[in-house]
Amino acid sequence: MNPRAVEIAKKLSPEQRAGQRILVGVVPSDSPEYITNLIDTQCLAGIFLLGHWTNRSKLEAMLSAVNHVSPQGIKPIVATDHEGGEIQNIRVPGVDHLPSQEALARMSPAKVQAVVTTGARQLAKLGVHMVFSPVAGVIDPRLGVRNKPIAKHHRGFGTDPHLCGQYSAAVVAGHRKAGIISTTKHFPGIGRITEDTDFKSAGITDDKTTRHDRYLESFRMAFDAGSEAVMIASAYYSKIDPGTLGLFSSKIMTDMLRGDFGYQGLIVSDDLGSSVSVFSIDGGHRASKFVSAGGDLAITADPLLAGPMIRALTSTATSASGKKRLVDAASHVINVKLAHSLTK
């Protein structure tokens, strides 16, 4: 951790520190003025692109506006999904179409790194800083395409933990070469569930993965390659923390990631805004539950939840331990921004 990150975080007000914990979704129909006003007035950590951006001029206008706002001297992160195949938000001229991870796994890891580096440089030139990729989760061979979140949509590298790790590490290396922040996902893996947590609240329990499971090797290899961020799954893991969604589990984020793995990077939530798996929880408290369990950066597809999330996060900072957690999480976000010249 850069000591400067802690120094900056401590100088912010509680509300500003809370804002630096939230990334909001942006769709092509949003106006740059609306989004930059949200970032500026709420000191938000940044944005992530949603939907299909096919008009380069419209995309450039949005990213130019966002990259010129700087609340408290801290620039926003611009993130996007760019796994390949079906999952890539940016589809404009000048950005190569990336094959799905399933297709990438038919190449050599060295070739994958080269392909990813080229695409990541194109994204960086547009003003993108962070990519929600790679998907490091290992697919249960007994499920195959019945695994809807990964296998059905060709999002995985396969069923072998070591090979998945090799390819995940290659993607991370490609991002790093281009100066892009990798977000390895969805820890501790969603290859052993049948339903997609974005659309279902049933069929999202992994009853096999354990705390020291061999399927976790792929994540460790991605971390060793330098993945600066990790996204937490919104599934249940009955052999790790029964009854608690992954992104609200201190056993997964604090005990496993920070403890077992010694991971010091940025811990990012899966979507807390529109995912069906979290609908039963008040919108604002989704962020505070995530952060209290050890998370750093909460993402919401619904930008209108930013205000309630800031209020909920601020309310948890009344105790000494709550304030320390808020400062610590904001410091992790700012630490990544310092490394990518998004603040000084």
State the predicted function of each range:
Residues 67-96, 116-142, 164-189:
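Glycine-rich, aromatic-flanked loop segments that form ligand/cofactor-binding clefts
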Residues 20-31, 99-114, 200-213, 273-281:
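Active-site mouth loops of central-metabolism enzymes
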Residues 321-328, 342-344:
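Flexible, glycine/charged-enriched surface loops at secondary-structure junctions
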Residues 27-40, 111-122, 212-219, 281-289:
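Short, acidic/polar
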Residues 19-26, 45-49, 76-82, 130-134, ...:
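Hydrophobic faces of well-ordered beta-strands that scaffold small-molecule active sites
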Residues 91-104, 144-156, 198-199:
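Surface-exposed, active-site-proximal loop segments in enzymatic domains
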